[in-house]
Design a protein with these regions (language model features):
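Flexible, compositionally biased loop and terminal segments
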Residues: 1-196
Length: 196
């Protein structure tokens, strides 16, 4: 099974807690690691996290730097778990963190394990444009997604891997991502089991 994760609500969470919007991204790190650990225990074979999009790079400089740093830290934290890691995104852009370029080919870390994909500076148009020039998606090493889980209550995919998620079930968690609890994952999985 492959699940996609859209960890939304970091900025709204920060505002609710009287913090700067930028501070919210750091609070999304621990939930990402906890969810990965649960997914591995549950037997999930592949998981894809949505870090940030090409469009997110149009935000104020402080926010861009904050989510870039959070994504670099998230990849390093997640990689401690024993994963087959792939970071996908437009590496030709200045918005793509230099530190993550070494992971743009799938890399077994700590013996490998669950296939972990992390979308960084990802754009669906950028992904699909490669079909015309090279005959395949930039994200061709990412398999079809069975379920997308989005935190933060929004009911949209925001350009999340449109080819791989075309038949995915879409589960929305109302909580903001930094408020993640273990029960969120199990609730989503129970919901998925009831789908056709």
């Amino acid at each position: 099974m492959h699940i996609g994760i859209i960890p939304d609500g970091n900025r709204r969470w920060a505002e609710q807690h009287k913090l700067s919007r930028e501070a919210g991204y750091a609070y999304g790190l621990k939930p990402g690691l906890l969810l990965l650990q649960q997914a591995k225990t549950y037997g999930i074979q592949e998981i894809t996290y949505y870090g940030f999009t090409v469009d997110n790079c149009r935000r104020p400089k402080e926010q861009v730097q904050a989510f870039q740093q959070a994504c670099v830290q998230a990849v390093h934290d997640l990689a401690t778990e024993g994963v087959d890691l792939l970071v996908i995104g437009n590496t030709d852009s200045k918005c793509f963190p230099e530190e993550l370029k070494k992971y743009t080919n799938r890399t077994a870390i700590n013996g490998g394990g669950i296939r972990l994909n992390f979308l960084v500076n990802y754009g669906w148009k950028w992904d699909l444009s490669n079909i015309k020039s090279a005959g395949f998606l930039h994200s061709s090493d990412i398999s079809r997604i069975d379920m997308v889980i989005r935190w933060g209550g929004m009911r949209r995919l925001s350009g999340f891997l449109p080819v791989q998620s075309v038949y995915a079930d879409f589960y929305v968690e109302e909580k903001l991502w930094p408020d993640y609890e273990k029960s969120d994952f199990y609730r989503a999985m129970d919901w998925y089991k009831k789908q056709d």
